[in-house]
Structures are given as C-alpha cells and as structure tokens.
Amino acid sequence: MAHQHTISGLVGKLITESEVNCNADKYYQIFKHHEDLPSAIPHIYTSVKAVEGHGTTSGCVKEWCYILEGKPLTVKEKTTYNDETRTINHNGIEGGMMNDYKKFVATLVVKPKANGQGSIVTWIVDYEKINEDSPVPFDYLAFFQQNIEDLNSHLCASD
C-alpha cells in the first residue's frame, strides 16, 4: 500500500495504491458494471444507480449511497470510462461532499501486474476546497483504500 499527497492551498491530490490478487479486467468491470458493488461490499456501498444515461456509458450520472466513517452519505457524480486503460473518473456534482469541495474527482486505475499475477489498483482524488476551513479529504483516501482491500477479498473469494 502506498499513499501520496500533494496539497497547495485549496487544491490537492491524494493517491492510494495497492497490489491485489485479482485479474485487472475483473476488478475494473465490477466498478464499471456498478450494480454488483452493494452486494459485494455492502458495508461500503448501500446502493448505486444510474440516474441519467446508461450506467456503463461515459457521461452517465450515478447516485452512490455509501458509508464513510460510520455515516451514511450520498453523492451524484458524472462518470467517464476508458476501457483501454481500465480508468474510471467519478466527478462529484451533488451531495454532501460538495459542501466542502468545489471540485472532487475520484479516479480509479487498474493495471495488470507485469508478471500477469494480479493487478495494481490506484485511486486518485483531485479536489479543490471551497475555503481554508474545508478538510483535506484524507477520510476519502482511507475509504478508497478500504474499497481496494475489501473488493479484492470479495473477488478472490468468488474465484
């Protein structure tokens, strides 16, 4: 597990990255085909649904209900996909987190390991705080790290 952060005033970037045992395509596809996430890791996601467009098409808007530090929260985000690079951008547009951030983009990147055994999963959080009092979203960095670990356990158990 590796963590990086770059913070300059109101703008910052947080990164968490881990190796997983799962196939890169399988890991990427469960996030692209989001309907299975609440049953795979229900302690993290309580529901997710496309509210505009088709959920697997770039430009769709999804509503995610999730648990962060024991609190139920909801966010609407615009999603873009790059199947070639196994990259998904989640651009927050509405919900509780947008009370603290002008911009909140969470990017998932899944790369196969060079030896063909498993993958490297990276979550990148690019954000711009509304003001100096808005927190650096370290809680979301921990949330995405938990996503990596718990989804890996679920997917490997189902192999």
Swiss-Prot record:
Residue stretches in coiled coil: none
Pfam families according to UniProt: Bet_v_1
Record-level GO cellular component terms: cytoplasmic vesicle; vacuole
Tissue and organ expression note: Laticifer.
Domain of life according to the entry: Eukaryota
Subcellular location: Vacuole; Cytoplasmic vesicle
GO annotation, biological process: defense response
Keywords carried by this UniProt record: Cytoplasmic vesicle, Vacuole
Role noted for this protein: Not known; MLPs constitute up to 50% of the soluble latex protein.
Protein name: Major latex protein 15
